[in-house]
Amino acid sequence: MGKIGFHSVRRAQPRLFLSLLTAILAVGCMEPTHEAFREPTGTPMPRITLLTYNTLHGLEPSGMTVRASESQEVRQARLDLQFRQLSLIQPDVMLLQEVNPLPEMAERYIAAMKRSGLDYQSVHQVDACGVRFAPGLAVVPGLNNGLVVLAKAPLRLRKVEGLKLSGGFGRCDDYMGFQTGELRYALIAEVENPNTERKVLTVSLHLHSGFERNAFFIQKIHEAVKAGKARQEDFTEIVAAMEQDQERRLEEIRLLVKEIDTLYAKGPYLGVLVGGDFNFEPDDPEYRELERAGLKDTYAMARPETEIYSLDPQRNIIAGHGTQEVPSTLRAAIRRLPESQQQKILEGYQRGITQARRVDFMFLMRKPSDSATGCFRQELFGESEAVSAAPGSDHYGVLVTYMADASQCG
């Protein structure tokens, strides 16, 4: 077995990663099984690990339906690699996206961890289902994709809700659903430390996709117009389509923040962890919206000196294959332009989306009174093993490790 590659950033952080995590998720010692009842001890463990990971559903659109984008053998090899790598790092909490099909695939993750002697619980929410009438009766049988949260024993896990963020009419659940367009959800779960009986809200989400790198391309268009290299009127439809995608994500974030605030006010929660595939980049309007709401990027909190790119088409061959796709909305927006100009726009789009970027995040909201000392490390998860040319997904996961002893991060 080859070594898992991790690109890491380590930094002492004496103020910021919280008694929230030590008090909530810390559990004294690593016990192999979940105990239903225990006397609270209040004893923290010195190390806590949190993972957000887009696992890749392996599907692609095909007319009015979807089809597998990879062979069964390739998919199984990817999953085996994921299971092997997850069993090595053994995260205390996992926030997963693009898990398909549900609920069966969530059970496969649990079973894979159990084979390594690890006991996990899971909750899930379907966010893409097509039309499903009953168990085993669906217009698109292979589609029941969605979000999962897993917690390692002895942590306790409870689903709070599957919050629909956007998509209008329609809903997806385990065995029944109706979907005519893209639906987006946030899976909100409660994680409890039985040793302290304290709780934290965790959220796994996958925001609207649409155009990739909206803010990046809008800025490039403005620069070209200002420099006299392009006419504003030629890009009106493109900018409008990009801004529409951006606004949809902003509305998804606002709805989520409103719900978090409501739950946070009602429940005995010490904090909130939000992780997932956000489909935006640092300093985009959506990122700033989360910051204004009091959610802090755990990576930025470490004051790193280098970037960690969770979507890197140059290094990740699966992500590289995805850059060949051009959104239908982009083709529609440029259809009235001369063919030569269309070609230049498409070439510019391809150059932009082949660049490495950070679109997967872990955000944290905490009590202002929190004064924990300690440090944390943020790393990529799921890079190719030495014996494998391909990673487990088109995204790398984001692994956050908190250590109560700040000297361990030096």
Protein language model annotation of sequence segments:
Residues 87-91, 110-118, 155, 261-265, ...:
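Sec-exported extracytoplasmic/periplasmic mature domains
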Residues 28-116, 122-123, 127-135, 139, ...:
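N-terminal, active-site-proximal structural segment of metallo-dependent hydrolase catalytic domains
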Residues 4-17:
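Bacterial N-terminal signal peptides that target proteins for export
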Residues 37-42, 97-215:
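Structured beta-strand-rich core segments of catalytic domains in phosphoester-bond hydrolases
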Residues 17-27:
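Bacterial N-terminal signal peptides
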Residues 49-55, 82-107, 150, 189, ...:
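Active-site beta-strand/loop signature of hydrolases that rely on acidic residues for catalysis
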Residues 52-78, 170-179, 208-248:
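Acidic/histidine-rich helix-loop elements
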Residues 30-40, 258-273, 278-410:
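Metal-dependent phosphoester-hydrolase catalytic domains
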